[in-house]
């Protein structure tokens, strides 16, 4: 399996009062000839929510397509199926979902990133 990382970005997210909320990490690879990733893309997009001074909840919101499970979402400790369309839709879906969970709109999330 050959792969090439095409996106690797971390965004520190704060609220309007500049209180640190957590970290968004987006990692996307282009994958060649792998039956586990028929779309040719492997991805992991995570919002690790700050739950204490030095503690983070990595299952607050995570979109990934782990090879054994396929595309799915981890939201507040529960798992849901996800239909992958393309990279742009993936990121848009994640940001909308995150905005809904945090009570922010997508523009506010991007503005703070």
How does the language model describe each region?
Residues 76-109:
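Short, compact, well-ordered microdomains
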Residues 1-71:
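The feature represents the first ordered module of a protein
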Residues 111-113:
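Intrinsically disordered, low-complexity charged/polar segments
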């Amino acid at each position: 399996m050959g792969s090439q990382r095409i996106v690797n970005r971390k965004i520190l997210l704060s609220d309007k009062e500049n209180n640190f909320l957590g970290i968004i990490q987006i990692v996307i690879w282009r994958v060649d000839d792998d039956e586990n990733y028929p779309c040719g893309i492997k991805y992991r997009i995570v919002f690790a929510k700050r739950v204490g001074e030095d503690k983070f909840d990595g299952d607050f919101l995570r979109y990934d397509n782990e090879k054994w499970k396929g595309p799915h979402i981890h939201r507040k400790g529960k798992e849901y199926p996800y239909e992958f369309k393309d990279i742009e839709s993936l990121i848009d879906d994640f940001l909308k979902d995150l905005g809904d969970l945090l009570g922010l709109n997508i523009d506010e999330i991007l503005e703070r990133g």
